[in-house]
Design a protein with these regions (language model features):
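Outer membrane beta-barrel
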Residues: 1-5, 15-189, 251-288, 293-308
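Outer-membrane beta-barrel pore domains
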Residues: 16-17, 175, 183, 190-350
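Surface-exposed beta-strand-turn/loop segments characteristic
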Residues: 9-13
C-alpha cells in the first residue's frame, strides 16, 4: 500500500504519481530445499514466484511464473562448496540477503540499479581463517534463461567475486565488525540499460539510462557492517565504469548507509559461511503470548547516473537522494508488518 505526495517540480520530472497510490499483491513465492544423501550431502534449492517483480538491470518482469533459484550446492572440501544453476551472484551483502530480512521494505536504489538479481552460472565459495574470512567467485552467462538469445556467444558473460573479513569479534560475540568488497566484470554483449525506482515498488522509474553498447564494464563494490547487541550499522558503495567512447566512458555510482535498532533486544545473528546477517531471531512470538520483535530503521541512499545518456530526450539519466525511516513488527520469524516513510529528491534536467 502506497500513499504518495509530490511537488510541481516532481510532477514535471516524472509525471503525476496519483495513479501509483494504492495497494497490490506483489507476488506469491514458493519453493523448496532438500538434499541428495551422498556421503557429503548435496543440497538442491528451487524457488519461484507468480506475478513477481524482480528488480535489477538483468532481471525480467513477468506476470507469468518466474524461476528465482534452481541451484545445486556440492561440497568440495570441509568448508568449500561448488554451486551450479540459477542463483545470486556473489557480490554485496544487501543483494545476498533476502529482501524480507532487512530493516527496509526495499533495497537501496544503487543496489537494484547496478547489481544483478540472479544469473545462471557456477560459483566456488568457502571460509577461511577460523571462519573469519569468506571468498567466493563465479562465472555467469544466462543463455539458458527465459527470453534470452539462443546461443552462449550471443549473451553477455560475467565474472564476479567477493571477499569478506571479520577483523573484530568481542569475547561474548555480541559486537562484530564486518568488511567486504566485490568485483563484477561483463563483456556487455547484450548492451547496457538500467533504471531505478525511488525505493518503493509500485512506482515509475525515477532514474533511467538509454540503451547503448559499451565495449565492457567493471563494477566495484565495498561494504562495512558493525553490530553491537541490538544495534546494526551497515553501508555499501557501488560504482560501475562503462567503456564507451561514444559517451565519454560514463561512471554510475552510489551508496547507502543504514541503521537498525531492535527495540526488544534481540541480536541479529551473523552467517560466517556466507558473510551476511541472518533474520532477527524473535525471542518471544505472539503465539507464545509475547510481543514479537520490534525494529526501527533509518537509511540514506544516493544514486548518480548523470554521466550516462538518459531515456528521455533532453535529460541525462539523473541523480536521486532518498531518506527513509522504517518500523518493523515481527510477530513470528515468518510473519511481519512494517511501515516505511521516504523523502526523495530527483534531478534529471541538470
Amino acid at each position: 500500500q502506497n500513499w504518495v505526495d509530490q511537488d510541481r517540480q516532481s510532477e514535471f520530472q516524472v509525471g503525476d504519481l496519483d495513479e501509483f497510490s494504492g495497494g497490490e499483491v506483489r507476488g506469491l513465492r514458493f519453493g523448496g530445499v532438500g538434499t541428495l544423501n551422498f556421503d557429503k550431502p548435496w543440497v538442491w534449492t528451487i524457488f519461484g514466484a507468480t506475478h513477481a517483480f524482480d528488480e535489477g538491470f538483468d532481471a525480467v518482469e513477468s506476470d507469468e511464473y518466474t524461476l528465482f533459484d534452481l541451484r545445486l550446492d556440492i561440497p568440495i572440501w570441509e568448508k568449500t562448496s561448488f554451486s551450479i544453476g540459477k542463483q545470486k551472484e556473489p557480490i554485496s551483502m544487501e543483494r545476498l540477503m533476502a529482501l524480507g530480512h532487512g530493516p527496509m521494505q526495499e533495497r537501496a536504489a544503487v543496489s537494484d540499479a547496478l547489481l544483478p538479481s540472479r544469473n545462471v552460472g557456477v560459483v566456488m565459495a568457502g571460509t577461511f581463517a577460523d571462519d573469519r574470512m569468506t571468498l567466493a567467485g563465479g562465472a555467469f552467462n544466462n543463455w539458458l534463461d527465459k527470453d534470452q538469445p539462443n546461443s552462449f556467444d550471443d549473451n553477455a558473460t560475467q565474472y564476479v567475486g567477493r571477499a569478506t573479513w571479520v577483523p573484530y569479534l568481542s569475547n561474548n560475540e555480541s559486537t562484530l565488525l564486518h568488511v567486504g568488497g566485490g568485483l563484477r566484470y561483463t563483456n556487455s554483449k547484450e548492451g547496457f540499460v538500467t533504471q531505478a525506482r525511488p525505493e518503493f515498488n509500485q512506482a515509475p522509474d525515477f532514474l533511467a539510462t538509454d540503451f547503448f553498447f559499451p565495449e565492457d564494464s567493471m563494477t566495484y563494490q565495498g561494504e562495512a557492517s558493525l553490530r553491537s547487541g541490538p544495534l546494526w550499522l551497515h553501508g555499501e558503495y557501488v560504482r560501475t565504469d562503462l567503456d564507451s567512447r561514444e559517451f565519454s566512458d560514463p561512471t554510475l555510482d552510489g551508496y547507502h548507509i543504514t541503521a537498525s535498532w531492535i527495540l526488544t533486544g534481540e541480536v541479529r545473528p551473523y552467517n560466517e559461511r556466507v558473510g551476511i546477517f541472518r533474520p532477527i531471531p524473535v525471542a518471544r512470538t505472539v503465539t507464545q503470548n509475547g510481543w514479537g520483535a520490534w525494529e526501527v530503521g533509518a537509511r540514506y541512499s544516493t544514486m548518480d547516473m548523470s554521466e550516462a545518456p538518459g531515456s528521455t530526450i533532453g535529460a541525462d539519466a539523473g541523480e536521486m537522494d532518498v531518506w527513509s525511516l522504517g518500523l518493523n513488527w515481527w510477530l513470528t520469524p515468518y510473519m511481519n508488518f512494517n511501515v516505511n516513510y521516504r523523502y526523495i529528491t530527483l534531478d534529471r534536467f541538470a
